[in-house]
Amino acid sequence: LNSVRALAAQYKDKIRILTGFECEYFPDYMNWLADMRAENHLDYLILGNHFDHDDEYGMYFGNIRTAAQLRRYVDSAVKGLETGLFSYLAHPDLFMRDYGKPFDENGRAAAKELCQACKALDIPMEYNLHDRFLSPVTHRRSYPDAHFFEIVRQEGVRVLIGVDAHEPEEIRNPAQWDLASRELEPFGALFEDHLCL
């Protein structure tokens, strides 16, 4: 954090550098997370809802196959958003990895419920490009999911483009960003090109 803050001060007239990170909603750690955010003066946190309750024994939400598991994902995401700690919801369509082929009524209902929570709380959803970089390796692509994001558009939820940034190339690839921007044109004013803090 110190080096990032030093760079932010050094380049303050050229670029705005913020501090924050993606993290889970683990109920037992929310007080710790709130304290840590305040103590470190972080600008934002991103809700990346990957695991149910914890990452050691909890179910991975990218492996959802049943309606009951999907219900757990939605409940966890909504509870995380309701904490007020998070500035946006990362890859909200993560559950589509294994669940959504084809996108059934339970999947559509889950998407709608997530959208309604985000809209009520005024929290945008991320149109995450990470799987586009990963799919040449895994030979499968799960998100961003067009069916899911059509519901997001219909529900009037704000969206922004993001990547997991596991590799620097994910950030340095303007072609992927340009493609995503074109895909989000139907969102009109709901598409935001930056996180409003």
Predicted regions and their residues:
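Extended substrate/RNA-proximal surfaces in nucleic-acid metabolism proteins
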Residues: 1-120
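Charged catalytic cores and adjacent phosphate/nucleic-acid-binding surfaces used
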Residues: 97, 102-197
